[in-house]
């Protein structure tokens, strides 16, 4: 009985080693490029997609995010049904007021319907622009590296169009301030 356990343990160890070696080799593609590194988001492409994204205000009127080009901007992907999104809005509004005088724009992108965003904004007024990007906003957030598809998701873009930070989950005001102060 003991020899069967030992034999089984040795088999499992050999199998695990083989899987580990295979996994290590498969993390390199045919060109020898690290697949994990290659999977990093192309942030320049994501920023270009952001500027071209079709968005509307809560009343359904088309808006243009391309007007933000050349300005540092905080983009917050959120939804009315997302508890953490709603909880962080007062902190984002406070930071917006604080950094507006430094020329940093804040924009909320509702991954939601026009109707839900409009009803939400009537109950909870926000002093920075909030647009509706709809459920396609999840694809745009993925382009910025949000592969989990979770909300809230915040992206900081500098005036040159470079992504300076991304955050999945509620923002930490101190953390966001450090990023904004460095712009």
Regions found by a protein language model. Give the residues of each.
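N-terminal targeting signals for export/organelle localization
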Residues: 1-52
């Amino acid at each position: 009985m003991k020899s069967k356990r030992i034999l089984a343990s040795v088999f499992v160890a050999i199998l695990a080693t083989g899987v580990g070696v295979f996994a290590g080799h498969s993390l390199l593609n045919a060109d020898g490029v690290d697949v994990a590194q290659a999977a990093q988001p192309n942030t320049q492409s994501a920023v270009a997609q952001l500027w071209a994204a079709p968005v509307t205000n809560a009343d359904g009127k088309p808006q243009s995010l391309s007007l933000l080009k050349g300005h540092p901007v905080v983009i917050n992907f959120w939804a009315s049904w997302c508890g953490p999104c709603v909880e962080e809005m007062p902190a984002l509004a406070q930071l917006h007021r604080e950094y507006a005088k430094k020329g940093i724009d804040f924009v909320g992108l509702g991954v939601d319907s026009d109707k839900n965003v409009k009803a939400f904004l009537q109950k909870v007024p926000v002093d920075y622009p909030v647009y509706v990007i709809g459920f396609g906003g999840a694809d745009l957030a993925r382009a910025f590296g949000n592969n989990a598809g979770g909300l809230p998701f915040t992206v900081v873009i500098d005036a040159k169009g470079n992504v300076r930070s991304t955050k999945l989950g509620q923002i930490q005001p101190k953390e966001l301030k450090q990023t904004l102060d460095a712009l």
